[in-house]
Amino acid sequence: MFVSRLAASGLLLLALLAVSLDGKPLQQWSQRWPHLEIPPLVVQNWKSPTQLQARESPAGGTTALREELSLGPEAALDTPPAGPDGGPRGSKAAAAAPQRLSKSKGASATSAASRDLRTDGKQARQNWGRLVSPDHHSAAGGGGGGGGGARRLKGLAKKRAGNGCFGLKLDRIGSMSGLGC
């Protein structure tokens, strides 16, 4: 049944095509397959990326922190150090130590830069310790600033604290608070 419908629709299409042409011969454009003239592919020559200098960032500028750390304490100074006769008094002490740096600009500037690079500070360690430690509770109460009823065990109680069910610590009266051990 399906094949007969397909054959009937094919014959109908051929009949309509013949009627639309009205017996005229095929035109030249319909004798061959119409296609657009596509030019052949052109190979593009790309320039290679330029090499960056050692102190140049990809954005084209210089990184101030990297430059300050690589050049040493002299880079932290706004003005070059005074020469032998460039001191305020022109004394021999200024001539004896021409490379002496002031505390406010030289040593502290480089230590401040290295302090900024440090990732794990004391405060971060304290916060992490509070999150990780299971003994300290966040609720208020208890004495000594340890947080909720945390108390320091001494002597034999300290040794027995780890002898609980599943390696958990026992509470003060020696039970596991409903774990069923």
Curated annotation (Swiss-Prot):
Residues 74-153 are annotated as: Disordered. Bradykinin-potentiating peptide both inhibits the activity of the angiotensin-converting enzyme (ACE) and enhances the action of bradykinin by inhibiting the peptidases that inactivate it. It acts as an indirect hypotensive agent. SMART domains: NAT_PEP. Venom gland. Residues 140-150 have a biased composition (Gly residues). Keywords: Cleavage on pair of basic residues, Disulfide bond, Hypotensive agent, Metalloenzyme inhibitor, Metalloprotease inhibitor, Protease inhibitor, Pyrrolidone carboxylic acid, Secreted, Signal, Toxin, Vasoactive, Vasodilator. The modification Pyrrolidone carboxylic acid is found at residues 31, 44. Residues 1-23 form the signal peptide. Disulfide bonds join 165-181. Its main location: secreted. This is Bradykinin-potentiating and C-type natriuretic peptides. It comes from the Eukaryota. GO terms for molecular function: hormone activity; peptidase inhibitor activity; toxin activity. It comes from Crotalus durissus collilineatus. PANTHER family: C-TYPE NATRIURETIC PEPTIDE. One of its GO terms (cellular component) is extracellular region.
